[in-house]
A protein has these predicted regions:
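Acidic, metal/ion-coordinating pockets
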Residues: 1-358
């Protein structure tokens, strides 16, 4: 039998459904998600009243009971490997993990030590074994799990600024080139996790928080790391973090989603919880996004289709009408063609990724 996995972007849910206006497009999206075999999301905040805020510019959390608001979206697997799940420390993160599990949602990407945080999840779905590997490359100080420290499953990225002396002499002030590469130990652990899991399951899905927050630009490390993950045995690499839809790539036939944009974006915007500078950051979020539909056929072949959505003014996701969906798809197609030689063709209410020229 085939398996359908739907993957979304980041979830920051801070409102109950009663606080949001009715919109049939929200319900239509929820029904689409509920029909999938697995729904995978990045839950980017703690659902807890425990802990204390970190020493960061942006901290947010939701009331514990709001975790139930995730259920109508069909969420079955939540990765906590991101840069905001630890906003209120380990006690709140662990509380969130337990509350997700209590709501019937499997939590991955955080644990009492590094081994626990990095531990893959294996699900038996329609006779197939699907493995999920979580990581984040965005790591607040002290958030990464260690051998004897709780936290999130992390791949540290080392950054260097490369200055060309000749260019600086001729054109003083020319920006340096920013070089980024995964820390060797973290990269090796991640690739070995994928290799080992690929020997034990039918398909490996890597869920990774990476890149930076806005626009379509990417960090240098992202594409090489994605390719290495597929070479190690991943059937799909599903990225998230950027607050705008980015392109998709087919590498050796396996899909890479660099970022689908936001899914639920209800960051607190009142003056009590956010400064004008922080509110300006939130206002820069793109309302355009998509969800990734991963279809695994009986032979284990993996296909990608994207379904455009938007985040409404109240932060909830909604399906788009045909014209608006086509506009989002044109943007994603342009990025996918330009960067990755990958095209998107209309297919079954969405847009299917194919090699360019196919």
């Amino acid at each position: 039998m085939s398996v359908r996995i739907v993957a979304t972007g980041d979830i920051v849910l801070t409102k109950s459904s009663e606080d949001c206006r009715d919109d049939p497009r929200v319900g239509a999206l929820q029904r689409m998600l509920q029909s999938a075999d697995v729904v995978l999301s990045s839950v980017e905040l703690p659902f807890s009243d425990l802990g204390h805020p970190s020493d960061r510019v942006l901290n947010f959390r939701a009331r514990p009971e709001l975790v139930r608001e995730l259920v109508p979206y069909g969420l079955t697997v939540a990765t906590l490997a991101n840069n905001h799940s630890s906003d209120y420390g380990w006690v709140a993160l662990d509380d969130t993990r337990r509350r997700l599990e209590g709501a019937g949602i499997r939590a991955i990407g955080a644990g009492a030590d590094r081994d626990a945080a990095e531990r893959p999840l294996v699900l038996e779905v329609n006779g197939k074994r699907i493995g999920f590997v979580p990581r984040t490359c965005l790591i607040p100080l002290g958030a990464a799990a260690g051998p004897e420290r709780p936290g999130v499953a992390a791949v540290h990225i080392e950054t260097a600024w490369e200055v060309n002396g000749e260019y600086q002499l001729e054109e003083p002030g020319v920006p340096p080139r920013i070089r980024t590469t995964p820390r060797a130990e973290d990269r090796s652990r991640l690739l070995e996790d994928v290799r080992a899991l690929a020997r034990d399951v039918d398909v490996v899905i890597v869920s990774i928080h990476w890149g930076w927050g806005f626009g379509t630009d990417m960090a240098e490390y992202q594409r090489p790391l994605a390719h290495e993950l597929i070479e190690a045995g991943a059937g799909a690499v599903l990225g998230h973090h950027a607050h705008a839809p980015q392109g998709v790539e087919l590498y050796r036939g396996a899909p890479i989603v660099y970022s689908p944009g936001n899914f639920i974006a209800q960051q607190p915007r009142d003056p009590e919880h956010a400064t004008p500078e922080v509110i300006a950051i939130y206002e820069a979020f793109s309302p355009d996004a998509y969800v990734s539909v991963i279809d695994i056929d009986e032979a284990g072949e993996v296909a990608l289709r994207i379904v455009p959505i938007e985040t409404e003014p109240d932060g909830r996701p909604a399906l788009l009408g045909d014209e608006d969906a086509a506009a989002v798809a044109r943007h994603v197609r342009s990025e996918s063609r330009r960067r990755f030689s990958t095209d998107l063709l209309p297919d079954n209410g969405g847009f299917r990724a194919v090699p360019r020229g196919a």
